[in-house]
Amino acid sequence: MSGLPTRKVASTYTSLNKHAFRVPVVPSNMKCSIDVKQAKLLSENDYFYIMHRFDIDNFEFVKLCNEENWKTISISIGVHDIDYQALENIFLNNLRLDFITIDVAHGHHSFVKQILEYICKFKTNETYVIAGNIATPQAAEDLVLWGADAIKVGIGQGYVCTTKDKTGFTMPMFTCIQDVAERCKVDIIADGGVRCNGDIAKAIAAGAKMVMCGGMFAGLIDSPSPVIKDPSNSSILYKEYYGSASARNKHTGTNIEGRSELIPMQHNTYLWKLNEIEQDLQSAISYAGGEDLESLSYIDIGWN
């Protein structure tokens, strides 16, 4: 039973480490969903972001954020020499770094273990480390043992991800999150499988602390994705949405597990979309009979 005088008073705030965010949603850390301009916009307005790791100098980005005193400084890294070098430069220069996301397709890997152990030698408690992607409770437990503060959960469920078709490896989003949450008490970032705002509420109900969305943002008018005109009708506009493991992003034809697709451009902005998500989550909280996101954890939400 709901006791809210109006759904507008329901709180959609969530927190990671010491940082509070207005909604439990983060744009995918892909080039078509996030760039420096959008990252700054999100940081200024108390939304979470994770900067992508492609064609970017992480040291220079973190340095810029420190110089401009961003509210949150959040990067992605891989497991290569260039990533170790960037981290070393950041730590040696005593730059503030709030969030590090180790972003690899198969997070339950010895290379991830090595870089987590490296990070833990130098980081302070102010730096929060996210690692992924994984899809099993055992993998989550190992990542926590290796030093991760949060786990990015999801394999093969993204709209432009072809991992499940090319390799056979995947797991439904809700089941995946629920299995990990039941066995491993760690902050979970759900990644992949969100097609509408209601799926965000379902992911929270399954046990996620934060939900990553790609296509939901890539198609917006102010996304970093290029605008493409319909060749037969120039008034019809599209945005290019492509996965991190796509040939479009990798600039190579090997080990491709993603595709590029044109999606209709939405004439709305990031801030408009995030406000819509906030309102829909407030309604979900009202239906759950609670006052905040925690209420979604105590109910069963079906997929229909």
Question: Language-model features: where?
Answer:
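Alpha/beta catalytic cores of nucleotide-metabolism and tRNA/nucleoside-modifying enzymes
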Residues: M1-S2, W146, G168-A190, V194-N304
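Active-site entrance/lid segments in N-terminal catalytic domains of soluble metabolic enzymes
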Residues: M1-D187, G215-F217
